[in-house]
Amino acid sequence: MKINVWFIFFFGALGGLLFGFDTGIISGASPLIESNFKLTVAETGFVTSAVLIGSAAGALGVGPLADRFGRKKLLILASLFFIAGSLMTAFATGFGTMAIARIVLGLAVGSASALTPAYLAELAPAKHRGSLGSMFQLMITAGILLAYVSNLGFLGHDFMGIRDWRWMLGSALIPAVLLFIGGLLLPESPRFLFAKGDKENAERVLTHLRAKSGESVEAELAAMAEVDKQPKGGLKDLFTIARPAVIVAIGIMFLQQLVGINSVIYFLPQVFIKGFGFNEANAIWISVGIGVVNFVVTILATMIMDNFNRKTLLTFGSVVMTVALAILTVLNYTVSVETAAIPTMLLIATYIFGFAISWGPIAWLLIGEIFPMSVRGIGSSIGSAANWIGNFLVSQFFLVLLAVFHNNVGGPFGVFAVFAFISIFFVRYLVPETRGKSLEEIEMDLRK
């Protein structure tokens, strides 16, 4: 592929960087905001979770708009919400303004999480769609890691008399502006253009993206034309031909969260502070280490994604997570806290490996692949909203679970182990195999 084509996929996936950056940045900023604004525990919790409320709303709301106006215009709009939300959080004056700012930021994050998987899937050729579609999750992990580094860099440094946490939150402006500039340069999805009758521009974009023979573009256009002939029921398609896809999208996104990934991302420092008595600096460095593991393994996942069946990788990841979490649970109930600390750290890293090689990228990849063109925007939105609702549930109840189990991390991680075990059977019996198939082939399989 030409370098400018990689530029398209890089900027197309940049919403994931902002998604991950916001996820990671609040873990370092929230204790500082709590202290600065003298917030109650409940208010601090709401500041953290407000973005999840906005994200669920943004994910659900953007789908119908994307199917009507296109992916590109909505990505540009999401970048403007990112810019506005970043500025609002950096200049918040108290609980109320911070909560509103976080909801605005959530609208942007949720919109990007629904738009990007569908957009990348519609741009990528079938044989590279796994790797290119996985760039969204790679960007999420890169954003999380950059946020951890930003937290460490700004912590305790009140440049120009401005509090450190304001610099942390304001630093999101850099990728937000990049997304806006990139959005202006990105092409519209060729499949969206074709579906709207603009076959000339669809062919032009495809020819540029493929940079191959005209025959391969013609074959792809012919497949689009075949799908375009199929009867379309509008939103009714969600409850008829797309119903299996809706079940898979909701299930895979709920399970991606219920295996506990964001308990690690949001609360890992608190796990080691409350559960093992680590000081704050060491706990944050552990988070950085886990962030590096997450990022590096996701790079590996993008490299191998088109070499293995999606279901094979998902099952492998489920087994690794189940075993790591089960051992972690037993360990923390059978040995002393001092003895369990280092093995727990290693088992969490193993669990992250299992997630990052499979469920991290593939869940987002699938929601961009499995829906028919007529409802791909709204279908991707439903899957993304399910992810945010699951995220909200995990983030709200993790610390409660930790307290219920008397700060023994084996308790909540044991619950996550059960969901990881359930995910094995969900993949086996419900998830379709999409590797190597064109989006049109996947849609025709749904219609059979």
Regions found by a protein language model. Give the residues of each.
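Alpha-helical transmembrane bundle of multi-pass membrane proteins
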Residues: 1-201, 207, 228-448
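TPR/TPR-like alpha-solenoid helical repeat scaffolds
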Residues: 217-228
